[in-house]
Regions:
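Short beta-strand segments
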Residues: 17-50, 56-58, 65-69, 77-79
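Short beta-strand segments in beta-sandwich/barrel cores
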Residues: 19, 44, 64, 93-94, ...
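Short, basic/aromatic recognition patches
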Residues: 1-19
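Active-site-adjacent structural patch at catalytic or cofactor/ligand-binding sites
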Residues: 61-73, 83-94
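Charged, gly/pro-rich active-site loop segments
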Residues: 4, 78-160
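A short beta-loop-beta micro-motif enriched in histidine and acidic residues
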Residues: 51-53, 121-122
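Residue-level preference for beta-strand/loop junctions
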Residues: 15, 29-31, 85, 122
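A generic "binding-loop/recognition-motif" signal
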Residues: 50-51, 131
Length: 160
């Protein structure tokens, strides 16, 4: 089993931007959505339109799963297919208005739209706070070690 610290896992999360957000609809149906996030201070921040279906689902049930996909490749041989490494965790999602955020974080999230009042007015920020443990696959191990599922798996507490 891969030995990882909480700090190492957070570093990998902070160095990436894409994840898959899992949630449950009001009808108890599983749903997932690919999202782009910003990680800061032990939370992940995701922008969305206020009227998006994922926002409605999260308002009804804040319990989520999030899987960060970390691209892997063989140096100098990009045609060889290698599965992505992953970090998966459970979390609690809350909804925040863009104006409730620190200005620097708002700029990181909305980039060129950070000063666009109309865009911000129709947006909401999903804040995911991880709970429990990070479950990893292929993080902190070589490509060869990823072939061994026992060596490739790892766990680390969300909070140190």
């Amino acid at each position: 089993m891969a030995t990882l610290t909480t700090a190492q896992v957070w570093k990998v999360i902070e160095d990436n931007i894409f994840a898959v957000l899992g949630m449950v609809s009001a009808k108890n149906e599983a749903r997932t959505a690919g999202i782009v996030y910003v990680a800061q201070a032990g939370k992940l921040y995701i922008t969305s339109d206020k009227d998006a279906w994922k926002v409605r689902h999260l308002a009804a049930n804040p319990h989520v799963s999030l899987t960060v996909a970390i691209p892997k490749s063989v140096p100098l041989m990009p045609w060889i297919k290698v599965p992505a490494a992953t970090i998966t965790f459970a979390g609690i999602a809350t909804l925040a208005t863009p104006d409730a955020l620190d200005p620097e974080l708002r700029r990181r999230l909305f980039q060129v739209f950070a000063d666009d009042a109309a865009k911000l007015a129709q947006s909401i920020v999903i804040v995911v706070e991880p709970v429990g443990e990070f479950v990893t696959y292929g993080v902190g191990v070589s490509l060869m070690e990823m072939r061994d599922t026992v060596k490739a798996r790892g766990r680390a507490p969300v909070k140190a």
